[in-house]
Amino acid sequence: MDKELRQLRQLFSSDNVRVEKCGIGKVNAALGAQCMINEFHPDCIISSGCAGGNGDDINVQDVVVSSELCYHDVYCGTAIDNTTQFGQVQGLPVRFQADEIMLHHAQQMKNENGFQIHTGLIVTGDWFVDSKEKMRSIIAHFPDAKAVDMESCAIAQTCYLNHVPFISFRVISDIPLRDTDASQYHDFWNTVADHSFQVTKTFVERL
């Protein structure tokens, strides 16, 4: 991950952009976002990383931009009034919405500069999806999910509570339903990650 952090810091050399590493998983992601908010008071937060993809139209190296986000490993019961849904933290939205202005800019980038960009639901959990069975269990609850990761929704929740606009970019590293041993994921880091993160730089330059 240190290599990827150096790559991102090289991409974003402006004093107006701060690049930080959160680490893997929901707690690390939330703590990283909160520290950034407390120290730098950002106008917005953009999360960049990789994710497993879902859908016939999704391929490795494509980019999924969050239109909405939720957890795939949270269940707080149904509540007395049956309002709480699977994936929802009780008292918070069923799904966290990406910032509309940033989402609009991201949608304008579709098919530009060779980028294949999809917008949709990103689901998050502390679970590395390395088998078809794991992926099927997630998609059973969230068939409309475009990507599955371990950080995005935790950052979205932190930003929601702090009233900071948020969006997540996830480069598709593998398609779990087409991969049996996580080989796509490891090949991704060896071959195409350097090029793929250029999409986030292009997005920042549009803001």
Labelled PLM ranges:
Residues 1-41, 58:
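N-terminal short beta-loop-beta anion/metal-coordinating cradle
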Residues 32, 101-108, 192-203:
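Short, well-ordered amphipathic alpha-helical segments that serve as non-catalytic structural scaffolds
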Residues 34-39, 57, 156-165:
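Alpha-helix C-terminal capping segments
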Residues 43-46:
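Structural motif
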Residues 55-142:
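Mid-sequence, gly/pro-rich, charge-dense loop/helix-turn segments that line enzyme active sites
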Residues 128-177, 181:
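A C-terminal functional module that forms or caps the active site or interfaces directly
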Residues 176-207:
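His/Asp/Glu-rich mid-to-C-terminal helical/loop segments that flank catalytic regions of hydrolases
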